[in-house]
C-alpha cells in the first residue's frame, strides 16, 4: 500500500473513532477516479440506512467522475436518508481533501436537507 493511501486511511480512522464516541449517524464518502459513493451509516457502524453512487441506475448513463455527478449523488443520498428518517449526520470524508467532488457532494446533501 502506498504511503499516500496509508496516511489517508489513518486520517479516516481517527475521524471515525471520534464520530463513534459522539454516537452520531455519519455520511461516509468514498471516491475513486471514475466513481463516487455515499452511505449513511448508523452510529455504531452496524447498518447502512441509505446509500447512493454514480453506479445507481438513475445516474449511470451520464458522466460519473466529475463534480456534476457528485452533486447528483449528494442530492440522491439526502433524499434517501430523509426517507429513512435521518436529518442530522456527521460528514465522514474518509481522509479525502474537502475539495472538488467531495465538497460538491457535501454541498448538495446540505441542499437536499441534511444537516451536518
From Swiss-Prot:
Annotated InterPro entries: Ribosomal_uL18_bac-type (IPR004389), Ribosomal_uL18_bac/euk (IPR005484)
Top-rank lineage group of the source organism: Bacteria
Record-linked HAMAP family: Ribosomal_uL18_B (MF_01337_B)
Disulfide-bonded cysteines: none
GO biological process, one term: translation
Similarity-based family: Belongs to the universal ribosomal protein uL18 family.
Keywords, comma-separated and alphabetical: Ribonucleoprotein, Ribosomal protein, RNA-binding, rRNA-binding
GO CC terms in record: cytosolic large ribosomal subunit
Chain segments annotated as transmembrane: none
Gene Ontology molecular function: any one: structural constituent of ribosome
Naturally occurring in which organism (per UniProt): Azotobacter vinelandii (strain DJ / ATCC BAA-1303)
Assembly and oligomerization: Part of the 50S ribosomal subunit; part of the 5S rRNA/L5/L18/L25 subcomplex. Contacts the 5S and 23S rRNAs.
Name by which UniProt lists this protein: Large ribosomal subunit protein uL18
Gene3D superfamilies linked to this entry: 3.30.420.100
Function: This is one of the proteins that bind and probably mediate the attachment of the 5S RNA into the large ribosomal subunit, where it forms part of the central protuberance.
